[in-house]
């Protein structure tokens, strides 16, 4: 009787973790573990892509959207995984999506408050 209960619990736990994995894996988290960071420096936005072990994507495209998800422009990254662009149309915030191909994407959101605070912080320095 105890063996049946143990087996049933094991099967239930296995199924639970299998379903969690199926939901989590396609999310792109496993896809090269691409990370993107964006911040404001004065009147420019700096973007940096990162891969595991300190590596950088050598090629890719950033897509910059406003807070309403309207594409503002796109730009190629530099071979060191960075890009920058003038800070414009930021009143509704910005979403910076980095696409390095083969479905490997990640994004960073700069809210209007983030942008305002980072600009003010830079002016104090």
Which residue ranges define each predicted feature?
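Bacterial N-terminal signal peptides
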Residues: 12-24
